[in-house]
Design a protein with these regions (language model features):
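Terminal disorder- and signal-encoded targeting elements
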Residues: 1-112, 116-169, 173-303
Length: 303
């Protein structure tokens, strides 16, 4: 697999878990700290007791002047910090295209644990979620989703010298997953299929699962294909488990590795935020129509 570097000029860190995006007038937030990108977990704000969203709406509408976005950071290549402390990634660029360029409003990202991100949204800690979040029935009972903006697959990442070459080979092994994710859900389904003969180690962030795989504490990681690919592109020590899977069975243009699920990402809203949801859907359609979406996609995932 060819190695790639997914870096792009991004946005400054404001501190306190808040990461600034561009404002409606085209300016960007001042960078208050410079943080080298690390495989360790970022400080996150996970409290759900007190609403913190303060952005005001534009006159005679429910559209904010600046939208506060909850996101589990880092989650390369969707949202992460560069060595210079800038926030970048596919979701970040989509946010810029949707909110700044289409809706003319500012945006800020707030780092939040994925496991508690939906309760935090519904408690008013931020306005929306953009965090490579899969649309599924369980989440749809608690939030409303935008139209899908990305298709992903759950995949299996192992060490290069591993004897694991199929999903069946996972029986009796130890698998690392991130808490609250559909990767964890896919692993739990395998655990049931194997009558419990699959041990799951759950981590607050996917970087913890990747580190455990490298260190030999788990034998595989189940996670989104693009995030697994980003990690595998950085080292010769990791590889995908290959073979046909759900995508191939569905006659889709399947990736060249085993797929456990087919999923669509969406932007999550509180269930009473219909006007803003509609405007965001219109903006998503517009960036697909004018080619902006394809440009962003090609930057992170083509080649």
């Amino acid at each position: 697999m060819d190695r790639r570097t997914y870096l792009k000029s991004g946005i400054g860190v404001l501190g306190g878990g808040l990461i600034a995006g561009c404002t409606g007038d085209g300016g960007s937030g001042d960078q208050a700290t410079t943080t080298a990108e690390s495989e360790t977990e970022m400080e996150t704000e996970t409290e759900t007791d007190t609403p913190t969203e303060t952005a005001t709406a534009t006159p005679e509408s429910n559209i904010p002047e600046t939208v506060l976005i909850g996101s589990d950071i880092p989650y390369r290549p969707f949202e992460y910090q560069t060595a210079g402390g800038d926030l970048t990634g596919f979701d970040v660029d989509i946010a810029e295209a949707v909110f700044e360029e289409q809706l003319g409003i500012g945006y800020e990202f707030q780092a939040t644990s994925f496991d508690s991100i939906i309760p935090s949204l519904n408690n008013g800690n931020f306005r929306i979620i953009m965090s490579a979040m899969t649309i599924n029935d369980t989440r749809d009972e608690k939030v409303d989703f935008s139209d899908p903006y990305f298709t992903a697959y759950q995949t299996i990442l192992v060490r290069a010298d591993s004897s694991i070459s199929s999903r069946a080979d996972l029986e009796g092994e130890v698998v690392g997953v991130q808490k609250g994710t559909t990767g964890a859900g896919a692993a739990e389904e395998l655990q049931e299929e194997f009558d419990g003969d699959l041990e799951l180690n759950r981590y607050d962030q996917i970087t913890g699962a990747f580190q455990a795989l490298t260190n030999g504490q788990v034998n595989a990681v189940i996670n989104d294909n693009t995030v697994n690919a980003e990690r595998a592109s950085q080292t010769d020590e990791l590889r995908f488990v290959e073979g046909d899977g759900v995508a191939a069975d569905s006659d889709q243009d399947a990736p060249p590795y085993l797929t456990l699920t087919i999923e669509n990402y969406g932007i999550a809203f509180r269930e009473d935020d219909d006007e803003f949801l509609e405007r965001v859907n219109e903006a998503l359609a517009a960036i697909r129509e004018d080619g902006t979406y394809d440009e962003i996609y090609s930057e992170y995932f083509s080649g």
